[in-house]
Amino acid sequence: MVRSEFEEAKNSFDYSLFESRRKKLYKELDKFVKRYTPNAILKLSLREYVQGHGGQDTFTYHVERTFDELGTISGSYCSIFGIFYSKNKSQYSFPPKWGDTPKAALKSILESIVDLIEAGAERDTKRIIDNQLAPMYKGKLLSLYYPEVYLNIFSDEHLKYYLHFFNQTSGGILSKDPVLKRER
């Protein structure tokens, strides 16, 4: 899309078509953030966190699917969440960096999520970058908890595209961590 096409699309866009949907979505987001406080996150069970058991009322389902319109990470591998339930194998799968058992892995992942949320509140970029969660997952969580601070674009290639498009390429930003590219 060239700049003139973008300007034309922007000028002819009818915001009223999605305004009510957006309001409902942000009401749901407010409920999500109030439900999943750092303390509540630390108490999640495997079934309350992980997709794969068939239910839709899990933390990861809400992050990925309920708020898809606020930035999509759908289509990513389930491993983006650190741990997932494989119906084919009837077991949990997770990389060894998170722990030796599903419970240990979950505990580590939940602690990382809480650390990320706290680092996002403090705008502690170093802690956010150092956090072991998958980059796209970190981006989605930060944009849900702090939508006024962190952009809801999770692909590094898309971030680079929009930085170029809007002439925001000074200071070597294109070669920096995606976290730095997402900060508003």
Language model: regions and residue ranges:
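Short hydrophobic alpha-helical segments that form membrane-spanning helices or hydrophobic packing faces
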Residues: K138-L144
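An N-terminal alpha-helical hairpin/helix-loop-helix interaction module that forms a charged
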Residues: M1-P135, E148-R184
